[in-house]
Structure formats: structure tokens, C-alpha cells
């Protein structure tokens, strides 16, 4: 048996230079430091007669590349193969039950290792510094992953933790900088401090539903982690648990959390959103450094444990608060018996948006919010809103997608309210004392809806007929009947009798004649020519244009007839009469008794000559017409 003396502290075969060594079958154990520091030999065969390998038996055998371990070995001592920096692979026989601390630590070129189901115990630091190890499967027989077992395994990309594991100790995966994802099974009850610290490529981690605490530094500097959900089983998030997770954008705090310790999320420079499910008052345990240097802008409440709203750190950072309290949450329903309304949010100095998805029987209280340029979205029915809920608030947009009617003048009493949107199923045209400007479907709360009160959007709605009051383009500045503005009558005076465009049958406000009809003048309200929904209106416009052409043609024909009639009248009646007057000569006026007497012939002549004194023959023609 190759064992040192009781007092010996030196290796039995120290500084062995032989390239290969075979241990004889008579050997049953390899003792303490037997081949310690044998840096030259490259291979070793351990026979089936050997049952145990002692502490540091092969430590520092830096050229050793091949090891054959017999099937009778049951345990490896501490540091048995530590610092064997040239070993690339090891197969552990099914006879082994225990691998002790540091057994393979520092084997930097080890890329694969097979651990059989016979192994029930893996010691701490067992594979520490195995920087070439890329993957490992932990057998179902292992119940504990001890401290620093894979510390510094920087090439490890995947690992499977079996359902048999109940605890993960401190620094178990510290510095596994290539590990991208890991699933902690429900069998795990806790994991210690720094368990996943410096896992810089870890982007996804699922924490089991039975973990009761997250240790300090557990995920410190996991700089690729983007989101984390703390399961409902967790009660404590220890100090610096997620310290400097620089890409973490959102977290969900589970229902049972009662304590969050200092710097838990400090220096998470991208953390903007927190979802709170806990019903416990955790503000007393939170110090100001818990979220230090976190640009949090959004709080989402899925619980009635609303005391978290009083946390001072949030007051000048949060811009959006959302409430979504599930009706099926029994804990929430118990809490609902204790409170009747949401708390006021007036201490949030930069808050500008509130979304309420579900608050069950809670109401919105007086002085709920204050500030300017608010957007409020309520996606479901709520019990009531206090008439003075928004009295110190100017609202850009208020959206209510519930169907139950809301009483009180809560919008009218606000400092201002620019836009009011409801569901298409909301029966009234007013809400909160304000007229509804748009209605939209519940499925798409962010899209602008239709304004039931705006003219010009539905061609069948009242108020869209261009002849309706308020839309007559004959208003000052818009009358196409002004001289030179009617494209169908260039150079004509529409003020003459028979040509007034406001007379029946010639009204330019009829469909098709008004150049300001919807679809022709994009500056008119409600006449967006790019809207495909107005195809019916466009068809009406085309029909109107055809009618306008016909009417214009008729007017032109009438003008031609009038001119012809005037020419006829002149040549057939007026010109012959003038010739007769020349033959008769000038007659003397007869004056009797101080009175001018006019002969019948002069009266007739005077009547006949009158048209020649008119300055505008067209005027006479029009009168005759």
C-alpha cells in the first residue's frame, strides 16, 4: 500500500520524472501527496485494487494528460487532482460516491467530465478554476451544490441542476462568465451569497417557486440580465443581491416579500420598471440606497399592498403608475376589506400618466393627482371617481373603456381637460361633466377613435350636408359666387337677375358645384382626403361634378338664346323705327297754358328711343329674358 509514514509531510514519489507510471495491483490506496508535484509524467493507470485516493495525491502534476481510474475507487480526497493543468477529460467510475473539496480545482484545460449517478456528494471548490469546462451534468443523486464548486469556470455555457438539489451554497457559480441561462428547480429552497455573482453573460434565469430567500450578492454584476421575477415564495431579498446589474430593465417583486435589504438593486442603471405583488408593508425595511442610481419611471401595482407608494426615493422619478389588482387574488380581497380607495399620488412630482386596469371595489379619492399634462387611462369599470379627484390637474387625455356610467363632474372640475375618449359601448355623450371627443373599441386603447360630435367624418351623419347651417361656403371669404371665383361662369356678373347662384336650381352649394365640397378643399374640417373610409363621399362628389357640368351647360345655352333674342330685337324693331323718325323730321313742342304738351308721335318716339340711351344692352336683354 502506497502510504506515507504517520509523521511524513513529503510525497512518497515526489519529483517523479518518468513519462508514465502504472501502479501495481497490490496497491489498495494512494495516500496523502503520493505524487505531489510530479510535473513531468503524462499518464497514470490506477488499478481496480485501489479503493481510495488520498488528499493531494496528484496535486501539481502539471503535465498529466491521461488518467485511468479503476472501478473500485469510492472517494477522492481533497485536492486529489488539483492543479493538474494539462488534463482535458476525466471519467469517474460508477463506484465513486464522494468527491471532496478542491478535488479537480485548477484543472484549467479540463473540458468535460462525467459524474455518475453513484456520486451523492460534491465538495466545495471541487471544480474551481476549471476555466476550460464548457458543460456539466449534475446527477440526480446530488442534493447539495456546495460553495464555489464551479467558481471561475469561465467557459461553462450550460449546466443542468436536477430536481434533487435543495440548496445552492455561496459562490457556487461565481464568475461563470459564459453562462447564458440557468433554471433553478422548485426543489431548491435557498441559495447563498454570491451564488451567481459575475455571471456577466447570464441573460435569463428562472428561480424556483419554493426559494424562500435570495442571498446577498447573489446576482451581483450579472451585467447582461435584463429582467427578473422574484417568485411568490421569497420573503427576503438580501443586501446587494442584484447590485450593478447594469442592463436590468424590469423586476417583479413577489407576493410574500417582507424585506429588501440595502443596495439590493443599487446601480442598476437601466432599471425603469417595478411590478409589485407583495401585500406586505415593506417600506420600513427599505433604505434609500436599495434603488440607488436606478432611473425608475414606472410602478405597476398588482396588489393592494399600496404602502410601497410612500417610498421617498420614487417621488421625483416616477412618471407612470399602473394599477392592476386581480379579482382572483384572495390576499388582495382580504386587503380590500381594510381600504376603500386608492391612496393619493400627489407626492409624485413628475408623474404624468396613470393607468387603471383593475381596482375591484376601490374608488379614486379626492385630490388623487396633481400636476400638468396628465394622461389617464381606465380600461375597465370602476366604482366611482370623486368630483374633486383631478381638481389640481390639467389633463391632456382621459380615456375610459368601461361601460358603467360614471357620475360627478370630475373632469369639469379639473384645471383643464383637452381630450375625452370612451368605449364605443359607453352610452352617453358626456362623462365627468365633459363632452366626449372620441369613442374607440376596448381592444385598442391607444388608437384614436371617432368623434361622435365632429362633423365631416360620416357622410350619413347630420351636420355633414354642405347645405347645413355652419357649413355654407357662402360665408364671407368663402363664397364661390363672388365675381371671378365661379370656375363655370368666367366674366359673368352673378348679381344680374336670373344668374344668382343662390336661386333655386343654380345653388353652387348643391353637391358637385361647390369647390369647397368635402374632398376638394383639404383645409375644411373633417375632410381628410387621405381617408379611404370616405369612398362613398367621393362618389357623391363625382356625381355632383357631373351635375355641375350639366347645369353650367344649361346656363350657357340660356345666355346664347338671350343674346340672339337681343340681336333680333335690335334689327327687327329698333333700327326700322329710327329710319321712320328721320323721315318725319323734328316736331315742335306745343306749349299751352304753361304746360308742355307732347304729341302721341313724340311719346312713341321717346319710348322707342329709350333703349339707345342705355349704357348696357345686356341689361335690357336680360330684362327681356
Swiss-Prot record:
Task: List the signal peptide residues.
Answer: none
Q: Which residues lie on this side of the membrane: Cytoplasmic?
A: 572-625
Q: Can you name this protein?
A: Putative surface protein bspA-like
Key word Lipid metabolism present = no
Membrane topology, from the record: Single-pass membrane protein
Q: Which species is the source of this protein?
A: Trichomonas vaginalis
Keyword Glycoprotein among record annotations:
yes
Segments of skewed composition (Polar residues): 588-625
- Give the glycosylated residues: 15, 227
List GO terms (cellular component aspect).
plasma membrane
Pfam families associated with the record: LRR_5
